[in-house]
Amino acid sequence: CYFQNCPRGGKRALSDTELRQCLPCGPGGQGRCFGPSICCADALGCFVGTAEALRCQEENYLPSPCQSGQKPCGSGGRCAANGVCCNDESCVIEPECREEFHRPVRAGDRSNVTQLDGPAGALLLRLMQLAGAPEPQPAAPGGY
C-alpha cells in the first residue's frame, strides 16, 4: 500500500525505516509509483492516469507500506520529478523540488524534450504561454 493511505494502526504504524521503495513503473521501469495512478521518473516527468501508471494499481494489494521520492513537499507529498511534488492522489508544480533534480544532460539522454520537438513542442509552448498569460481584456466597441 502507499504509506499515505495505509490504515492507521496497521501498516502505517510501522517506523519510517521499514518503508520500501514503491513499485517501478513507466517506460523501461525508469519511474516509481507515487499513487495508484501516478508514475514519476526523474528524466521523464510524471504520468497521471496513463498506461505508464497502470502498474501502480498493484501497490494497493501489497502487504508492506512503500514511499517514493526523497524530499517531503506540499501537503503530504514528496518531490517526484524536476519541479513536481506528488502525494498518492495528485501532483502539483513545486519550485522547492527543482533543486533536487539538477543533473547534467548528456547527448545520449532520452527525455520528453526530444519527443516534443517540432509542431508538438510549439503547441505545448503556446499552451503554457496562454496558461500563464493574464486574462485578455474585452475590446472597446468600434476601436480596432
Curated annotation (Swiss-Prot):
Residues found modified as Glycine amide: G9
Cystine pairs: C1-C6, C22-C66, C25-C39, C33-C56, C40-C46, C73-C85, C79-C97, C86-C91
Keyword Secreted among UniProt keywords: yes
Gene3D superfamilies reported for this sequence: Neurohypophysial hormone domain
InterPro entries in UniProt: Neurhyp_horm (IPR000981), Neurhyp_horm_dom_sf (IPR036387), Neurohypophysial_hormone_CS (IPR022423)
GO terms under biological process: vasoconstriction
Single GO molecular function: neurohypophyseal hormone activity
Keyword Calcium attributed: no
Glycosylated position list: N112
Annotated site residue numbers, Important for agonist activity on V1aR/AVPR1A: G9
Key words of the record: Amidation, Cleavage on pair of basic residues, Disulfide bond, Glycoprotein, Hormone, Secreted, Vasoactive, Vasoconstrictor
Subcellular location(s) of the protein: Secreted
GO cellular component: extracellular space; secretory granule
Record field: transmembrane: none
Main location: secreted
Role this protein plays: Neurophysin 2 specifically binds vasopressin.
Complexes and interactors: Interacts with vasopressin receptors V1bR/AVPR1B (Ki=85 pM), V1aR/AVPR1A (Ki=0.6 nM) and V2R/AVPR2 (Ki=4.9 nM). Interacts with oxytocin receptor (OXTR) (Ki=110 nM).
PANTHER family: NEUROPHYSIN, VASOPRESSIN-NEUROPHYSIN 2-COPEPTIN
Family membership: Belongs to the vasopressin/oxytocin family.
Protein name: Vasopressin-neurophysin 2-copeptin
Provenance organism: Cavia porcellus (Guinea pig)
Record gene name: AVP
